[in-house]
């Protein structure tokens, strides 16, 4: 062991917690290739700040024994330690790393369960499906929110019914919103009732998510509902509805999209122009020409592109009919 590393090793066991904490912070910047053996003992240091820094220093190390040591840190008595553990564990990339976290999905206080669910989400571990489904009925909103996130990542059709129920009835707006977004992985129209119902949710963010998800799924049966959403009290919802009407090439949306070209919010005017270009109906030419005088330069630019798109589409259509 070289002199620098020897000094760090001595500082790691110093009687002064501040010295130990600074040694932990310095360790990743040393030239030592394998710092894990020096860091792991500091996970059980008597000082919470030392434990916290040791956790942070272990970020990016995904060997099984490291994950096995980090997972129990979610149960630490110190909230700062638990938070750091949750952040580091949520950066895991390998599916097999979910193993040590699975037992924590249904045990411990709500904060621990929520952190564990968040950590396994991106790992897409099939073993997390059952605990996540069970957690949809947890009394704690943060646990339910993370459970919905896990199911959204897993994309298992068996969860669609439960997610639709959560989207409609969970008492927390954010949980309902995430559930609506999670329904976006469905490949059938079975989610249509849940999504159209969500367009009338009391929370505007839920309605916003529903309008976007309907376009993502290209559910043309939702066009009448999206047209109604163009009258939503929140312009953010109208923006998503306009975007989806464009993706669906919904001619039924022309009147509401044209009306939006004079809205005070430029973002809505932009989306309306884009949607009219995507729909490609010649009835939109005159309103789009008027949009060339819009005070927002982006709206004017997009209007020119939309007009060019409609003209080219009509030309191609005419040439196709004549051949």
Predicted regions mapped to residue ranges:
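Core register positions within helices of long alpha-helical scaffolds
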Residues: 26, 57, 88-91, 119-122, ...
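Ankyrin-repeat and related helical/solenoid repeat scaffolds used for protein-protein interactions
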Residues: 231-305
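Non-membrane alpha-helical segments in proteins
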Residues: 21-26, 48-60, 83-87, 118
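Alpha-helical segment of the N-proximal tetratricopeptide repeat
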Residues: 7-30
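Amphipathic alpha-helical scaffolding segments comprising HEAT/armadillo-like alpha-solenoid repeats
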Residues: 1-11, 32-44, 63-75, 94-106, ...
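Short inter-helical turns and helix N-cap capping residues of alpha-solenoid HEAT/ARM repeat scaffolds
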Residues: 15-16, 46-47, 77-78, 108-109, ...
């Amino acid at each position: 062991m070289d002199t620098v590393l020897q000094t760090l090793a001595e500082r790691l066991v110093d009687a002064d917690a501040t010295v130990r904490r600074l040694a932990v912070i310095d360790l990743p910047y040393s030239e030592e290739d394998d710092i894990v053996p020096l860091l792991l003992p500091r996970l059980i240091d008597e000082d919470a700040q030392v434990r916290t820094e040791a956790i942070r220093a272990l970020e990016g190390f995904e060997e099984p024994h490291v994950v096995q040591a980090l997972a129990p840190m979610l149960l630490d008595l110190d909230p700062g330690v638990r938070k750091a553990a949750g952040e580091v564990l949520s950066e895991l990339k390998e599916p097999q790393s979910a193993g040590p976290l699975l037992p924590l999905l249904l045990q411990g206080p709500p904060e621990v369960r929520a952190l564990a669910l968040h950590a396994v989400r991106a790992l897409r571990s099939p073993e997390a499906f059952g605990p996540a489904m069970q957690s949809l009925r947890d009394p704690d909103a943060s646990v339910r929110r993370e459970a919905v996130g896990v199911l959204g990542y897993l994309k298992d059709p068996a969860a669609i019914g439960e997610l639709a129920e959560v989207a409609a009835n969970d008492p927390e707006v954010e949980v309902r919103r995430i559930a609506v977004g999670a329904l976006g992985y469905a490949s059938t129209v079975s989610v249509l009732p849940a999504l159209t119902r969500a367009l009338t949710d009391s929370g505007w963010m839920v309605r916003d998510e529903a309008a976007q998800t309907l376009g993502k799924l290209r559910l043309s049966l939702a066009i009448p509902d999206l047209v109604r959403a163009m009258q939503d009290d929140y312009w953010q919802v109208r923006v998503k509805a306009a975007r989806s009407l464009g993706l669906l090439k919904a001619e039924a949306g022309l009147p509401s999209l044209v009306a939006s070209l004079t809205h005070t919010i430029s973002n809505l005017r932009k989306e309306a122009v884009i949607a009219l270009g995507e729909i490609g109906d010649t009835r939109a030419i005159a309103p789009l020409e008027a949009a060339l005088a819009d005070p927002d330069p982006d709206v004017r630019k997009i209007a020119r592109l939309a007009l060019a798109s409609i003209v080219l589409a009509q030309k191609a259509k005419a040439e196709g009919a004549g051949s």
